[in-house]
Amino acid sequence: MNLYLIFLIVVGVVGLVLVGLFLSFFSVWLRALLAGAPVSPFNLVAMRLRQVPYSVMVDARIRATKAGIKLSIDEIEAQYLAGGNVIACVHALIAAQKARIALDWQRACAIDLATKGSGKSVEEAVRTSVDPKVIDCPNPESGRTTIDGVAKDGIQVKVKARVTVRTNLDRFVGGAKEETIIARVGEGIVSTIGSAESYKVVLESPDAISKTVLHRGLDVGSAFEILSIDIADVDVGENVGAKLQEAQAQANKSIAQAQAEIRRAAAVALEQEMVARVQEMQAKVVEAQSQVPLAMAEAFRSGRLGVMDYFRMENIQGDTAMRNSLARPEDKKQ
């Protein structure tokens, strides 16, 4: 009796599970049929076995069908298995169709997979293509608030720009993103300011910057099409030219001081060398003077010098010393 009761309980539980599954499949199948997007029950069972949320797949197909877009359940399931967001892809297709933008399922799936994990989505790409977005240049998140350029007269000009772009769906996959647009526009603005003869030219016609930059085709190879570049603010910065001249003058001054110090050191060294040479010459004079008495003694012995000659020489030396003392009286005062 107990085994029979257990058997009935098991059969009842299995029956309830089967009925629940049947009702689940039946409700989805019926919803698709009534919406004009019929799905085979075998496809529903197969998706269940593949752990695919068949209800989401059917809902996506119903939305596409109601919008007049023909999609098979296999195409939707393939995008899901590839890791895409099928609902977002369908919404993007519907938005593109309403805006009369050429976008097919394959391209929408490619954009969806390309933007996965980047914070973007295929819906945003289509939305930007329909409703252009404005990009601040430079990006405030970069820490810079202005794009700085220097005119030919050395005056710095600070510029804020706003770039209006529209998504180019044909180049969205593999195309350069917003960072590249900001970098290119910044480079163009700096180049345009640098080619101006004076900062006054930039202040008088800031629209010339946007026109010049816009004509350079900065959106080539990017995922966006630049519609306009507007100069939001122009300010005068520092006199960079004067600062550079001041720095150059300071550098020249330092170089001149170093060269003067080198020449002074060379002069001091030469002076010391001359002092040493004078001392050397004086030593030679003293040495020569010390040889005079010896030579006189030798002259006396050999008879080449007489006594009268000696006294005459002494008198001459005395007269010479007296004349020298008379010629330099200041030496006596000292």
Curated annotation (Swiss-Prot):
Transmembrane segments annotated in the record for this chain: 3-23
Classify the main location. membrane
Q: Which family does it belong to?
A: Belongs to the flotillin-like FloA family.
Q: Does the keyword Cell membrane apply?
A: yes
Membrane-topology descriptor: Single-pass membrane protein
Location of the protein in the cell: Cell membrane; Membrane raft
User: Is Transmembrane helix among the key words of this record?
Assistant: yes
Q: One cellular component GO annotation, for this chain's record?
A: membrane raft
The job of this chain, per UniProt, is described as:
Found in functional membrane microdomains (FMM) that may be equivalent to eukaryotic membrane rafts. FMMs are highly dynamic and increase in number as cells age. Flotillins are thought to be important factors in membrane fluidity.
Q: What is this protein called?
A: Flotillin-like protein FloA
- Identify the keywords attached in UniProt to this record, alphabetized: Cell membrane, Membrane, Transmembrane, Transmembrane helix
Where in the sequence is the signal peptide annotated?
Answer: none
**Could you name the domain of life of the organism this protein comes from?**
Bacteria
Q: Could you describe the subunit structure of this protein? A: Homooligomerizes.
The source organism is: Opitutus terrae (strain DSM 11246 / JCM 15787 / PB90-1)
